[in-house]
Swiss-Prot record:
It comes from Micromonas pusilla reovirus (isolate Netherlands/2005) (MpRV). This is Putative non-structural protein 1.
Length: 485
């Protein structure tokens, strides 16, 4: 994000893993999505009450998979299955599995680009996998599950591809991603056993991968895989030791998941390549539902209308825009090609054959928190210059409360920003939670007063925000004036 200030560089985008897991329970729900997303809960096992879950699914007319996907998305954490080969405690993981695994449990993940020293070309994840299969030979490569962590297809294309293989597409969920290599929480796969003995890791901290690095070659990666394969299976040994492996790894060990498993039973370790919040590695952002502000419609700018989005989530169904049925929507999504969508204000009489809206906007209730958590990783939020923020608010509004969400929202993608404003609108009008599920939130009723939101925006002026965030600030201010009428 070009032009961001030093203030916004104080936080790095290393918080891309999750800090808790969820489990269904007969006990009361003890999860507050905001606390989890903002990193206030560490190695925390959250309980989701079974009866509350069933009631939500019945009320929203959702099946179990959709309900599970919704909760994972708004909490930013996955459910785990006790059958997973990971021992979990309520504080830290006791250990990671260390015994040799069978052939069908070996998975190679590749991410980013790597240089082929023979052709001097940079290979993407899929091309890297194919080249590695050739180098390893059929006897070894046939016993490895190959995954390319590259979002190359839109959901319609993925659906068609999976249908050919008689497989259903699980929910594509951002927290099931690996962390960045340079995160201090990441460790090399080759040291896994030793680390798990001496300094138990959270089981949900995935093994590192490498961002684009032109110094590493396909040959290096080939060597690593052979070593890793030998260590994990005890077969096909090679005359190299762990210490001979390169210092960086693009590998991740995850157990294989059988075909046609229900979404709820998917192992935690299975990773898919999307985010409902801030996308990374160059992927386009996930489109959110159109808003229904009514009289409080926030006017979209030409910049807002020019941003391309994708729909990476098979639970987000796009239905044709109908002028009579959807006349209260603030905008619709115009499909540009098989992958990209752009917001559109349909003119009267205009052909709407390639225009769509999200079929079930309730699936996004609370998604504003997901997007905010991702924007926070870029440095905004009540944690930055907290003393200055509190002083500004206390001096002008005679209160020490401030909406940290409002500060973070200024850095969100435009579609996500408008949805967050819509959630403020819903909460302010109803004085009820914006979530479809009864989480244990810190506040009931209205989350903040109009003055507290205004205080946050005043405080934001004390930060050296990038230009696009300043524009968001103006839109937010106009929205609050309409809401306060």
């Amino acid at each position: 994000m070009g032009g961001r200030s030093g203030d916004l560089l104080d936080r790095r985008t290393s918080r891309r893993g999750f800090t808790c897991v969820l489990e269904f329970s007969d006990s009361d729900t003890n999860v507050d999505p905001v606390s989890v997303l903002m990193g206030n809960e560490s190695a925390f096992i959250g309980k989701i009450n079974n009866d509350d879950f069933k009631k939500m699914c019945s009320r929203m007319n959702w099946n179990e998979d959709r309900g599970t996907a919704y909760i994972e998305s708004v909490v930013g954490a996955p459910f785990y299955d006790l059958s997973d080969p990971v021992v979990v405690s309520h504080t830290r993981a006791n250990k990671l599995i260390t015994s040799p695994v069978s052939y069908n449990e070996l998975v190679v993940w590749t991410q980013g680009k790597i240089r082929d020293s023979e052709t001097d070309k940079l290979l993407g994840p899929t091309a890297t996998n194919e080249a590695l299969k050739t180098l390893l030979g059929s006897e070894v490569s046939a016993n490895i599950i190959w995954k390319a962590n590259s979002l190359e297809y839109s959901v319609p294309k993925l659906t068609a591809l999976y249908a050919k293989g008689d497989r259903s597409i699980p929910h594509i969920f951002w927290t099931k991603q690996t962390l960045e290599f340079n995160s201090p929480q990441c460790h090399e796969w080759s040291a896994m056993d030793e680390i798990s003995k001496n300094d138990p890791l959270d089981p949900l901290v995935m093994w590192p991968y490498l961002e684009e690095d032109e110094e590493r070659t396909l040959k290096d990666l080939h060597t690593e895989i052979r070593i890793w394969y030998s260590l994990r299976t005890g077969r096909n040994p090679v005359k190299q030791t762990v210490s001979a492996a390169p210092s960086k790894s693009t590998l991740e060990y995850v157990p294989w998941v059988t075909r046609n498993m229900s979404y709820r039973s998917l192992p935690v370790q299975i990773s898919y390549q999307s985010s409902h919040g801030l996308l990374w590695r160059g992927n386009r952002p996930q489109l959110y539902s159109s808003t229904l502000f009514g009289d409080n419609t926030v006017e979209l700018t030409p910049y807002d209308m020019s941003q391309p989005y994708v729909n990476n989530d098979p639970f987000v169904e796009m239905i044709p825009f109908n002028r009579e049925i959807h006349n209260d929507y603030d905008f619709c999504w115009k499909q540009l090609n098989d992958e990209y969508f752009m917001r559109k204000l349909p003119a009267q009489g205009e052909d709407s054959s390639n225009m769509f809206v999200v079929g079930d906007s309730t699936f996004f209730l609370g998604m504003g928190s997901v997007a905010i958590a991702w924007a926070t990783t870029l440095g905004a939020g009540a944690g930055i210059h907290q003393r200055k923020i509190r002083q500004v608010v206390a001096r002008r509004y005679k209160t020490d409360d401030v909406s940290g969400h409002a500060l973070s929202a200024l850095l969100m993608h435009s579609s996500h920003f408008y949805w967050y404003l819509y959630e403020i609108y819903l909460n302010h009008k109803s004085s009820k939670s914006v979530y479809a599920f009864p989480f244990r939130e810190q506040k009931s009723g209205r989350y903040h007063s109009i003055s507290e939101y205004k205080g946050a925006l005043d405080a934001a002026l004390q930060l050296n925000l990038p230009d696009f965030a300043i524009k968001r600030l103006g839109q937010f201010t106009k929205f609050l004036k309409k809401l306060d009428l």
